[in-house]
């Protein structure tokens, strides 16, 4: 009887040394995200965070999200350095809607075979997103799972926790007819609608390198999601915001009603902005109806803010000074009966 071959974890497809190399590669990037409330270092069994002392009655706000099938395009085009920013943006932009300051972030990276270089790029992007959001990257999980993913495929999930003063929670309850709506421009499709985007690319047989306003189509599509946290935190310090809506999956039709009282509707002036070229390209090459565009994509608007009309000028001045492209997009009106809660003129 022959002696059985001695097996190792690596023989089964899990390379512990590669995982350790990844941790070494990301340490400097992670340190850039540090906040004074964070206790301990990367690598513990659990990450510790004190509550900031400035809050009298702190309320924790949590969120989790992914990047969706935007990852498919990123993997196919070997563009790994921006999807981490997308991941943080999808979570932290959801938190700021409640008025919450993001505190810390954790990520989950799963793959069949760990590509240290690609994973390093992804996590460095996550760290950059945390810097832009002002939160600490305090931990994560890298799962190498042979047999679960094909080839170079990987998946991402993010988890973010923030804090808001209890008296300052923004939940839409203060919204009234007569309030104004301010739009903050998106950087592109952000991280939603990519199954439809990929279908448009398929049926149109478009060249991803097609020049669109001076840069390749694929670069427009993979442009990282805009993070609005720091500019909106400054806005909250200076004015009374009644509601905010992060325009993600479901577009205008699904997201704005989430923050409106039942007796209010949003009246959006469709001629108050021009869609970025990439959305016009998608609409034309996919033969997509306008309603479907607004239901699927942000169409150039990544965040909508509701506030008293007399606060609009000061808010626009502040937001544009902070580097946002912000404008008056509409107002809040009284809703009658079973009217839709979003009307686009």
Curated annotation (Swiss-Prot):
Family: Belongs to the AIR synthase family.
Signal peptide annotation: none
InterPro entries recorded: PurM-like_C_dom (IPR010918), PurM-like_C_sf (IPR036676), PurM-like_N (IPR016188), PurM-like_N_sf (IPR036921), PurM_cligase (IPR004733)
Superkingdom per UniProt: Bacteria
GO molecular function, one term: ATP binding
NCBIfam families per the UniProt record, alphabetical: purM
Lineage, highest ranks first: Bacteria, Pseudomonadati, Pseudomonadota, Gammaproteobacteria, Alteromonadales
Protein name, per record: Phosphoribosylformylglycinamidine cyclo-ligase
Subcellular location: Cytoplasm
Reactions the enzyme catalyzes: 2-formamido-N(1)-(5-O-phospho-beta-D-ribosyl)acetamidine + ATP = 5-amino-1-(5-phospho-beta-D-ribosyl)imidazole + ADP + phosphate + H(+)
EC number assigned by the record: 6.3.3.1
Pathway: Purine metabolism; IMP biosynthesis via de novo pathway; 5-amino-1-(5-phospho-D-ribosyl)imidazole from N(2)-formyl-N(1)-(5-phospho-D-ribosyl)glycinamide: step 2/2
Species assigned in the record: Shewanella sediminis (strain HAW-EB3)
């Amino acid at each position: 009887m022959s002696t059985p071959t001695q097996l190792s974890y690596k023989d089964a497809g899990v390379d512990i040394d590669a995982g350790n190399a990844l941790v070494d590669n990301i340490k400097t990037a992670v340190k850039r995200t540090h906040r004074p409330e964070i206790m301990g270092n990367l690598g513990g069994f659990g990450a510790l965070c004190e509550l900031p002392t400035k809050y009298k009655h702190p309320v924790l706000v949590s969120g989790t999200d992914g990047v969706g099938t935007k990852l498919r395009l990123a993997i196919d085009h070997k563009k790994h350095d921006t999807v981490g920013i997308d991941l943080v943006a999808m979570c932290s932009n959801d938190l700021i809607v409640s008025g919450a300051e993001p505190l810390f972030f954790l990520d989950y990276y799963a793959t069949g075979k760990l590509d240290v270089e690609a994973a390093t790029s992804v996590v460095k992007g996550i760290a950059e997103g945390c810097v832009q959001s002002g939160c600490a990257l305090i931990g994560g999980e890298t799962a190498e799972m042979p047999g679960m993913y094909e080839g170079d495929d990987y998946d991402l999930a993010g988890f973010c926790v923030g804090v808001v003063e209890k008296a300052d929670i923004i939940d839409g309850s203060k919204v009234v007819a007569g309030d104004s709506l301010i739009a903050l421009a998106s950087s592109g499709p952000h991280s939603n609608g990519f199954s439809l985007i990929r279908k448009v690319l398929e049926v149109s047989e478009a060249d991803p390198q097609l020049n669109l306003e001076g840069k390749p189509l694929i670069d427009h599509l993979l442009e990282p999601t805009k993070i609005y946290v720091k500019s909106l935190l400054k806005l909250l310090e200076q004015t009374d915001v009644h509601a905010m809506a992060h325009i993600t999956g479901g577009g205008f039709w699904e997201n704005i009603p989430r923050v409106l009282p039942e007796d209010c509707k949003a009246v959006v002036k469709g001629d108050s902005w021009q869609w970025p070229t990439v959305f016009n390209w998608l609409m034309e090459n996919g033969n997509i109806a306008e309603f479907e565009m607004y239901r699927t994509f942000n169409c150039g608007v990544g965040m909508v803010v509701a506030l008293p009309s007399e606060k609009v000028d000061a808010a626009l001045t502040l937001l544009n000074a902070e580097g946002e492209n912000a404008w008056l997009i509409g107002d809040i009106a009284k809703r009658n009966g079973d009217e839709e809660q979003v009307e686009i003129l």
